[in-house]
């Protein structure tokens, strides 16, 4: 027979559970107006280095050709629901990158059963070193940009895309103007919808779950209306105690050539922002982001 105290605890738990169900049914969709609390979170700044590769052999290297940053903020609501925001930004510095002006960033926001993301990048059609050489020392005042806005929830996956021409100014002081222009273009873009068996994570959130849990090896994530496999392998760095190397690959669920990357993290960090990131951006270009001291 249940005790009076036990019955009271059961009723309290049922009340909280019912309240959460009601809140989930009635709450407004997740938006960028909803942000983690006052906690500053974690931020890391990077220096970008570039390496040109021909026939699999590195033939040219240049340091400090750009910069980047990563941030991780999260907090719990009164009901214990976790709100998390992740962001990564990278850009080339034209004065250090032979006039090449490239910029890209992705930001994601999530809570229980729902996630949104917003991305913006300079369009880079070059597929070979010869084509990339023609893009150097450009005097063009405008550049083409691609923007994307995505939402994942129990209702499925929604994606909007935009391609637009705007001033080729990507320095931090000019960035907000460019972001506002991208949001304007996306607001007028058509939305494509697709179904999903469950609510998928966006890319940075899927990666963050791996970095926090060494037991995880593979998961799916959604981007641009498609599903991808993210697979990782971890190994401790013998020469750097407390540092773990994470080797990963991205591949569309329906198949295709994988995209590979490597990053290094502090093993005990609650918000393991990478110390170093290596990424094969093009067949001829390898980028490395190293954390600034």
Locate the predicted segments by residue:
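N-terminal export signals
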Residues: 6-24
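A generic signature of intrinsically disordered, low-complexity regions enriched in glycine/proline
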Residues: 13-17, 153, 178, 217
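Acidic, serine/threonine-rich low-complexity disordered tracts
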Residues: 21-156, 193-293
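Surface-exposed beta-loop interaction hotspot
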Residues: 160-194
